Amino acid sequence: VSKPELVVQDFGGAHNADLEGARARLMRGGSWKRQRIVVIIPAADMIPAKVALSHWNLAFPPNNGVVRVLALGMEVGEAYSSALESILANPQFADWEYVLFLEHDNCPPGDGVLKLLERMEEHPELAAIGGLYFTKGPAGVPQIWGDPKDPIPNYRPQLPDPAGGLVECCGTGQGFTLFRMSMFKDPKLRRPWFKTTGSATQDMYAWSDFRQHGYRCAIDCGVKVGHFDMKGDFGIPEMMW
């Protein structure tokens, strides 16, 4: 039983009480405009249950389009390039705003997409922004590849920002990275965009060309992404690195 009291309540709500603040928050996130996202997930036949749970819990901008493309049984570079070709050839999706690369062993936070979108709104000069994750194993390094201030092209792993800021780099991993769709329409870019070679992984192969054409990227160290080792290839089975 409630204690005796007289209640005079403002039914306007907390957000209405500070419309200026609410509007500024919505402007930062950009969810009031089109933020349609194609999600590309390269995978074998199965995705670990713990990883799948993190994917299911991802929040997307309300009432914006989302379509998920599962690229099964292909080498990862081929999976990305083939999926992108099919998307750009489809008039229903070719003009969407973003493409999110999400790998079968990466576990992003539930608000990760929204945070990356907010960063993209803040930094129109960047073509891609990824979440922060490390290579697997006890000696793992952050997938913040290359120092853009060095005049010599490089992909040395850079230090993360403990304060959760952006770190610009020469290339990103693809585990949880948001790209502007418009970049892939640039006819000057090499095709296939992604390809694993004897000397480069598919992501570094791609960025070696993207940067030559003026495209820039960064890692958002406030979006912390796990890297799941199901079989224990790098130590303990079912370890989240």
Briefly describe each language-model feature range.
Residues 2-21, 27, 32-34, 188-241:
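C-terminal catalytic/acceptor-binding lobe
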Residues 2-73:
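N-proximal low-complexity "stem/linker" segments adjacent to membrane-targeting elements
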Residues 51, 79, 112-113:
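Residues at alpha-helix caps and immediate loop-helix transition turns in enzyme cores, especially N-
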Residues 76-92, 207-208:
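Short, conserved alpha-helix that lines the donor NDP-sugar binding/gating region
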Residues 94-107:
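Short beta-strand-to-loop acidic/aromatic patch adjacent to the donor-nucleotide binding site
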Residues 96, 123-126, 215:
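Short, high-confidence coil segments that cap the C-terminus of an alpha-helix
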